[in-house]
Amino acid sequence: RYEEVTDPEILTRIRQYELAFRMQKKAPELTDLSRESKATLENYGVDPDRPSFSRNCLLARRMIESGVRYIQLYDMGWDSHGSLEKDHRRQCRAVDRGIAALIGDLETRGLLDETLVIWGGEFGRTPVVQGGGENWGRDHHPHGFTMWLAGGGIRGGTVYGQTDEFGFHAVENRMDVHDLHATLLHQLGIDHEKLTYRNQGRDFRLTDVGGRVVKELLA
């Protein structure tokens, strides 16, 4: 059909189907952990037959090795308005082991320098508790919280920014989300000032007018 009408939309649709086929063909191999060594599984704390965040971290490493360029991992259950002490202990143990194993594994395999690892969420938690008794927790808090980056040309061992004595507001080297985006785009080789989209007659930047690359974070 494409040879008859030479419609680029038909060619695009054909390529989409071909890409989907290649991805489906590769998926069973990617998720087969039987080829991983016992030492690797123990390092991640993975039971191949049970879903876990650590298992997802190991799958992420396998996807990176296979050439996947963007991977997003989710971990649910952090909305800790109650039962914070009990729930966070459990979740931190599960997450810390998997993410530490992933970073170490990427470094051992020579992949960390070309892989940018980003850890964080859309907000933190208040430094004061809500609720009472054994069911206390912390509310949403966007005014001062932490994210971390590893690999991908990021300077290791660097702390950027500081909160007040209560841990409530960021007061030193405050970093806006547009600064974060500008820095990440820079590490991906994209000039954030030229990455624009047009809406209602004018150009907009994803990093707005104030976003800047935070060079103190770069190796």
At which residue positions do the language-model features occur?
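Ligand-binding pockets and gating/stacking loops
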Residues: 1-219
